[in-house]
Amino acid sequence: MSLFDTINAGGAELLGFAWPTVWAVVRILVVSVVILLCVAYLILWERKLIGWMHVRLGPNRVGPGGLLQPIADVLKLLLKEVIQPSAASRWLYLIAPVMTVVPAFAVWAVIPFQAEAVLANVNAGLLYAMAISSIGVYAVILAGWASNSKYAFLGAMRAAAQMVSYEISMGFALVLVLMTAGSLNLSEIVGSQQHGFFAGHGVNFLSWNWLPLLPAFVVYFISGIAETNRHPFDVVEGESEIVAGHMIDYSGMAFALFFLAEYINMIVISALAATLFLGGWDAPFEFLSFIPGIFWLVLKVFALLSVFIWVRATFPRYRYDQIMRLGWKVFLPVTVVWVIVVGFWMMSPLNIWVK
């Protein structure tokens, strides 16, 4: 019996009919607190890593080695006044930052941390994740419109166009995973990557989806960078053009919520990429399978997040027309062609996904 089964059985015996509700609330709170801590130290890791790439030290004054810098940043933002422009639509202006964070948290309901460790093990988990992660752009549009500022509105329109341009390519990449796994359940998708010739010989990482679906994996991850408005796709908030885009009139914690959502979405994209293409909680080699699965998932997510940061420190910002061209003229045709190729592959005698 696993730890979760033991807790569940003990709680049901202690609290009776009220236990399912209490257990659900406890799991949601635990996951939410862990995500907030991860965001805080992801920001510190980003500043440290970029500092090292620039041959600097990065934050190193608050606490030992700068470990308390995230706490100092949060306290600073909490103490700042939330200023509202006189021409803004009051309630919409205040609701928009909250609307960016809620979908970012909601996606975690279906992401499995290891076998049987998931908030909601639903059969349509992949569809839910795709749908709920697309809602955040509406908050960006709302923020740009409610601010009643030309720069904010321009940033919001850029965000809408960018989301539409890359959401389709991401969707086709996920269709490929659905075709090969035969399920929308994220736990079953991880399970489908644990079979095959290489997995049977103990080399698990060669059985993961990243190898046969490599174009889809690359398109999904780069599209994820664009979806989160990260560098080099950050024309939505391009400092040299429109200062801060849709966030230009926000301050204090309202401003911080936009960045909180951005970093949560970075972790979501990395967690989904690890789950769909990198075997989720599966160990790369069979002889390492004694290590808890959540360790491997965290390691894969950390590696992908480091790629996010490396891309920011390395590449120049794309022009707006270059971003649109990449989405429509490169990624979309590549994913459509690969869907057709994999379809014929699965119908041929060389099908490697036979269950």
Curated annotation (Swiss-Prot):
Pfam families: NADHdh
GO CC, any one term: plasma membrane
E.C. number(s) listed in UniProt: 7.1.1.-
Keyword DNA-binding part of the UniProt annotation: no
Membrane topology: Multi-pass membrane protein
Reaction(s) the record says it catalyses: a quinone + NADH + 5 H(+)(in) = a quinol + NAD(+) + 4 H(+)(out)
InterPro entries (alphabetical): NADH_UbQ_OxRdtase_su1/FPO, NADH_UbQ_OxRdtase_su1_CS
Compartment list: Cell inner membrane
Superkingdom as given in the UniProt entry: Bacteria
Main localization category: membrane
An MF annotation (GO) of this entry: quinone binding
Record field: transmembrane: 25-45, 91-111, 126-146, 170-190, 205-225, 253-273, 290-310, 330-350
Keyword annotations: Cell inner membrane, Cell membrane, Membrane, NAD, Quinone, Translocase, Transmembrane, Transmembrane helix, Ubiquinone
Root EC class: translocase
Binding partners and assembly: NDH-1 is composed of 14 different subunits. Subunits NuoA, H, J, K, L, M, N constitute the membrane sector of the complex.
Functional description taken from the UniProt entry: NDH-1 shuttles electrons from NADH, via FMN and iron-sulfur (Fe-S) centers, to quinones in the respiratory chain. The immediate electron acceptor for the enzyme in this species is believed to be ubiquinone. Couples the redox reaction to proton translocation (for every two electrons transferred, four hydrogen ions are translocated across the cytoplasmic membrane), and thus conserves the redox energy in a proton gradient. This subunit may bind ubiquinone.
Family affiliation: Belongs to the complex I subunit 1 family.
NCBIfam families: PRK06076.1-2, PRK06076.1-3
Name this polypeptide is given: NADH-quinone oxidoreductase subunit H
Source species: Burkholderia cenocepacia (strain HI2424)
